Amino acid sequence: MKAPVIEVRDLDLNEAVRNVSFTVARGEVYALLGRYGSGKTALLEILAGLRRPTGGAVRIRGVDPYADRNAARAGAVWRDGGLFPGLTVAEVVDTWRRWTLDPLTRDRALRLARLTRLADVPFERLTIGQRRLLDLALALVGRSDVLVLDEPTAGLDTAAAREVWSVLRALAADGVAVVVTTRDPDEACRADRVGVLDEGRLVTGRDAARLRAVRPRAA
């Protein structure tokens, strides 16, 4: 069994997250499934280092994100995404690279997110799905081996959602540890493992294959 890259132990955040524990290995996609208000986004914000837990522990690459934020940094994609008027796709990535001082090249970030052919396209002309892929490219620039994504396919049509998941699976195959949140059981089935959240508690965790067996649409 691979050593975990993400470790969550007995995590609490007031009433939003309650005694949650799970691990994610390198090359694994882990889905947090739950309805609105179940604690998914709050948990992701803790993993991204944006909210300090009131109890328990988090380790990213073995490091406490609140002791060494840079060493434990994770790339993050939030549901609302970013707005970059007046810039092309390549210019957005270049600007982000300079801000984060990350050595990942612009061309590699675009290639990983499958945006190379759109490098010179203005941000305003991108579809919603393409904007989501751009957000993913920026998350890779920030820290490319651990990614957390808040409902990355929300609002996308079927083709765009498939493209996002195709990129995520390719990244996982390259060793990236991925955590996604979703309210859709069929979406969750695309992950390797699923944790079901209810009122801040992780009520079950299982292999996605078991869910796929009873939800054929996600196969």
Which residue ranges define each predicted feature?
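The feature captures the beta-strand-to-loop junction immediately N-terminal to the Walker
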Residues: 33-35
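Helix-to-loop junction immediately C-terminal to a conserved catalytic motif
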Residues: 48
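Conserved ABC transporter NBD signature motif
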Residues: 56-72
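Conserved ABC ATPase "signature" region
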Residues: 94, 104-119
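Hydrophobic anchor residue at the start of the ABC signature
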Residues: 136
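Catalytic Walker B motif of ABC-type/P-loop ATPase nucleotide-binding domains
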Residues: 147-151
